[in-house]
Each structure stands twice: as structure tokens, then as C-alpha cells.
Regions:
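Cofactor-binding beta-sheet edge motifs in enzyme active sites
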Residues: 1-282
Length: 282
């Protein structure tokens, strides 16, 4: 593990100005180091500035499933939630208001309908989150339900809708979506490399926390089949929805906005999330 390449770490800054009706008038998004994949917002905005800034890393960097789209979607979709809450608008309605692309709207609505978003019931220690996005020709939306007990976060249920054009092999596609959710859960909640005194101290696989059977939620996939659209890949895009959906659910349950990955490797930190910057740990 001390020799391996690392997913690029990065810092992401996001900013926006809203119109009185809740549409996005101005949008600004900067990714430092982790990459440009998934950088561009899929939402309709009045004007935008979106840039990826390269920087030198002390670590050897390489690819992660979905590349930087995992980090960019985490930052953007959590920030979309912040914007929705700032004007007291439901996060689903806020996304639909700003989503003009038919395919994006379809996956958002499909995930919300299957999840039962409008009939969700808020109880103590229970939270619900939603996210959406686009990458590599595919559109994805995820809804997550989590529970929090004494700082320990349990992802209870995930519904993910995915559309990548014409579906050729439905069973294999469902496996890709569900596998991406499982892998994305690890990056969202647990997986990290720790350093001390310029050395890697997570130097054994037994010290590297990955999702266990007990961590796995109920996963439901909704596959939208568009026979009128040429098939796109499905191996990477489904991973981008899980982290922001869980992050938004944690906020819904606790009022804590966590802005770095992984979010809760050892439970929720006290007073998490006080900055407007989003960071992705490799």
C-alpha cells in the first residue's frame, strides 16, 4: 500500500447567485488538482465560470472509478443542497427547477418516485438526501436514507436511477449500478490513507476500512431504457451519485454539513463542516 498510486486529492470552491424564483443566475466552480471530469454543471445557469487548476502533488496520482467526477459531483450536489436550504426550497424541487435537460429531469424524477421522496417522514436521527449528475454520456440520480446513532452513520437505503441510452443487457447494467453504489459507499464513508511525519501509516490492508456486509444498504436500481439513443458506458458514471446523496442525508439528519471525503470513517466529527470549500481526500 505504501507503493500504490493514490486517487488525486483536491480542493473545490463553489459559489452561486440565485434569482428570486430560485433559478441559478450565476455559477462559479473551481477544482484544484483532482481533475476536470464531471466539472461542468448539468443544470441551466445564467452565466458560469468553471475551471480546473493543476497543482503539484507530493504523491503519485492515478485513476479512480469515475475519475474526478466523484469529487466534482460531491462538491456540486452538496452545494446545490445548500442553495436549496438557503431559500427554504425542497432539494428535489430545486433541482427540477434548474434542470432543463430532459434526460437529467427523467432520472431525478425516476429516483424520487421509486424512493418515495415526497412521502418521506422525518424522525429523530433519520435523514434523506438526493443528488444528480451527468458523466460519460450517462445521467444518474440517487436518493439515500441514513440513520445516525451516537455519531455512527448507517446508510439504510439507496435508490439510484441511471440512463445511458439504449439498454443492451439489463442484468449486467443493474450489476454495474449496484456495484458502483457499493464501491462509492466506501469512498464516501470509510476509505482513506493516513499520514504522519511524512510517512504512510495506513500500510496494511487490515488497516484500510472498506464497506462490510453490515454496512451495505438496501440498493434499488431504476434503469431508464432509451432505445432512441445510442448506448453509452455504464462502468463509471453510477458511482458519482452516492457520496453527495449520503452527505445531504447526513445534513438532513444532524444539521452538520460535511465537506470532505471520507465523511465518517470513525463516526461523525463534532462540529463538522464550517467552511464553504469542498475537499476530496485521496
Amino acid at each position: 500500500m505504501t507503493w500504490a498510486y493514490f486517487r488525486p486529492g483536491g480542493v473545490i470552491d463553489a459559489g452561486a447567485r440565485l434569482n428570486p424564483d430560485g433559478t441559478i443566475a450565476e455559477w462559479e466552480f473551481h477544482n484544484y488538482n483532482s481533475g476536470p471530469s464531471g466539472l461542468q454543471t448539468p443544470y441551466e445557469v445564467g452565466s458560469k465560470k468553471e475551471h480546473q487548476h493543476q497543482s503539484k502533488s507530493p504523491l503519485r496520482q492515478s485513476s479512480y472509478r469515475g475519475l474526478a467526477a466523484t469529487a466534482n459531483h460531491f462538491a456540486r450536489e452538496c452545494y446545490m443542497d445548500e442553495l436549496a436550504h438557503s431559500i427554504q426550497m425542497d432539494p428535489l424541487e430545486f433541482r427540477l427547477k434548474n434542470a432543463k435537460n430532459e434526460r437529467l429531469r427523467n432520472v431525478i424524477q425516476a429516483a424520487a418516485d421509486k424512493f418515495g421522496w415526497k412521502s418521506r417522514k422525518k424522525t429523530l436521527g433519520r435523514g434523506f438526501g438526493i443528488s444528480a449528475g451527468f458523466e460519460k454520456g450517462g445521467y444518474v440520480a440517487a436518493c439515500a436514507e441514513i440513520s445516525v446513532t451516537h455519531g455512527a452513520v448507517k446508510v439504510v437505503r439507496v435508490v439510484e436511477a441511471f440512463e445511458c441510452g439504449a439498454v443492451v443487457n439489463p442484468e449486467h447494467l443493474a450489476n454495474q449500478v449496484e456495484g458502483a453504489v457499493a464501491m462509492g459507499l466506501g469512498g464516501a464513508m470509510f476509505e482513506q490513507i493516513d499520514f504522519a511525519d511524512n510517512k504512510i501509516i495506513t500500510n496494511k490492508l487490515s488497516h484500510y476500512r472498506v464497506p462490510r456486509f453490515a454496512d451495505m444498504p438496501v440498493i434499488e436500481s431504476v434503469l431508464l431504457d432509451r432505445k432512441d439513443i445510442v448506448s453509452a458506458g455504464a462502468g463509471e458514471t453510477p458511482i458519482v451519485g452516492i457520496a453527495p446523496a449520503v452527505g445531504n442525508a447526513i445534513f438532513d439528519a444532524t444539521g452538520q454539513r460535511i465537506r470532505s471525503l471520507p465523511m465518517a470513517p470513525k463516526g461523525l466529527p463534532a462540529g463538522a463542516g464550517s467552511s464553504s470549500s469542498m475537499a476530496n481526500g485521496g
